[in-house]
Amino acid sequence: MTKANFSNSLPLFWGHAQAALHNQIGMAIDVLLGLQWGDEGKGKVVDFLAPNYDIIARFQGGPNAGHTLRIEGKKFVLHTIPSGIFRKELVNLIGNGVVVDPITLVKELDQLSAIGVDYADRLLLARKAHLILPTHRYIDAASEQAKGKEKIGSTLKGIGPTYMDKTGRNGLRVGDLMLPDFHARYEALKEKHLTIAKLYPTIDFDLEAEEQRWMECIETLRSLRQVDCEYYVAEALRRGKRILAEGAQGSMLDIDFGTYPFVTSSNTISAGVCTGLGVAPSAIGEVIGITKAYCTRVGSGPFPTELEDEMGAFLRAEGSEFGATTGRPRRCGWIDLPQLRYTIMLNGVTQLAVTKVDVLNRIREINVATHYHYDGADNDQLPFDLCQTKVTPIYKGYQGWEQSLDDAKVYQDLPVATQSFLGALESALKTPIRMVSIGPEREKLIVKTT
């Protein structure tokens, strides 16, 4: 699908009213984000939709994210750079809401260069994005280790400490790299961190080596094109450019509305686009929510539908469920409708993409959690604190299709049982399913037009 014919297909894909708005003024940012605990397959869907846009923008998170793409049979994992970087016609923007580790970013850039991706004219970096220092990672690791059995499952990438400095008004930003007194500012913040680090037991961390590498990498950041994100996006919208905001992690890891304290340190929901790119709420157009056909979670925290039996192990093996960033095995369970209703509500989701449907190919009966039972009653809402409330999922079983989906090219090619399962999800969630992923490859994504 090319940009030239994209507007003609919009009525099928986004609906008549929104298509008319896009065609008239072009002033909307579409949002794509995960509706579970992350790892929903956002990178693949962004890559699929990318030709319909001019700009792909990350608006929150940092190198704790891991977006996996398979292009021409090869696997690529992006942690900070937007998933549109492989398409030479697109601009990729790292927004002000993202926290940037120069070492991780340069490693990604080196990997792109090694496969012939010329990122120089494709990648923009917001001046107001905050920097992850080596001492942020040191504090993160020391703090997590000190928690013992109470660990929250940090990726140890320095994300939390960096956001703490941001809200505490102590942080360093990308734009600060160009200031003549940057080194003095860096040293002052490092000393604060080292004072904090004394509160924790000593850990194995070669700070001197990490700092040396960090200083080398910031020279690359200085060479990248830096922009005032808010002005850049506003001007792009004024000129009718199409923008897709790419979320990281998942909605259930949102700092305010996720399973606190087992959450990330940023707002992963659609509201984060406004602060993470510097745009007004009225600029938000479509909100595309991504969910797996089952559910996974990495690290600690509540997970109502978790399967700690052979079925859980089967889903993990069949779905290759190991963290793209940490390599940790993911916890697996059945799809959770109360949880999805919650995140659809929070995000204002207008359409759904269901991924990894093929992972269920060999299952005879597929369970779906339709409600919860807690505090002596059935409920379709999440309790205030999933960590402290004993929740029992109430399941409904659906017939599996027990066959490969490889030959399906359009939605109608899917087995009747597959269509029935997806139709039941669509009906229960009261949100249209527009995309169905039946394999890891780029071409294994079906657009549902009716």
PLM ranges: what are they?
Residues 25-450:
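Non-transmembrane, aqueous-exposed alpha-helical and coiled segments at domain scale
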